[in-house]
UniProtKB/Swiss-Prot annotation:
InterPro entries, sorted: Fibroblast_GF_fam, IL1/FGF
Lineage of the species this protein comes from: Eukaryota, Metazoa, Chordata, Craniata, Vertebrata
Protein's recorded name: Fibroblast growth factor 2
PROSITE patterns the UniProt entry points to: HBGF_FGF (PS00247)
Domain of life: Eukaryota
GO biological process: angiogenesis; brain development; cell differentiation; cell division; cell population proliferation; epicardial cell to mesenchymal cell transition; fibroblast growth factor receptor signaling pathway; growth factor dependent regulation of skeletal muscle satellite cell proliferation
Length: 158
């Protein structure tokens, strides 16, 4: 295709398979989000005491999350009111830390079903996931294709 020819279509390079779809430059904050889990209809919640779980109540102040691009396709997830970062520990537990560590970075990937997945950068076979009960699902029990790992980012402005 001739570049700039009348009626031509500009083709953009394909996105890498690292989940880098539409990533912002490092340090850029997107608007706060709520992460809605397809499994059980829970919103991911980061509590001030460091616990992580899911809740169905849209007005819960602890479901407002700040996703920050750390590098292409990699985000940290911070609870706005808890002021803590989502982390995955070496045993697969999800909890929230006051300071971001290597355990707080996740590969954000838009899946073909338009849900996002958040895979630990440090423990790369493990995903952020919620069970049908609203409890988090430990990393070693997660994997591709599970409903528990699918999250729909929704605006938290309202």
């Amino acid at each position: 295709m001739a570049a700039g020819a009348a009626g031509s279509i500009t083709t953009l390079p394909a996105l890498p398979d690292d989940g880098g779809g539409g990533a912002f430059p490092p340090g850029h904050f997107k608007d706060p989000k709520r992460l809605y889990c397809k499994n059980g209809g829970f919103f991911l919640r980061i509590n001030p005491d460091g616990r992580v779980d899911g809740v169905r109540e849209k007005s819960d102040p602890h479901i407002k999350l700040q996703l920050q691009a750390e590098e292409r396709g990699v985000v940290s997830i911070k609870g706005v009111s808890a002021n803590r970062f989502l982390a995955m520990k070496e045993d697969g537990r999800l909890l929230a830390l006051k300071c971001a560590t290597e355990e707080c970075f996740f590969f954000e990937r838009l899946e073909s079903n338009n849900y996002n997945t958040y895979r630990s950068r440090k423990y790369s076979d493990w995903y952020v996931a919620l069970k049908r009960t609203g409890q988090y699902k430990p990393g070693p029990k997660t994997g591709p294709g599970q409903k528990a790992i699918l999250f729909l980012p929704m605006s938290a402005k309202s």
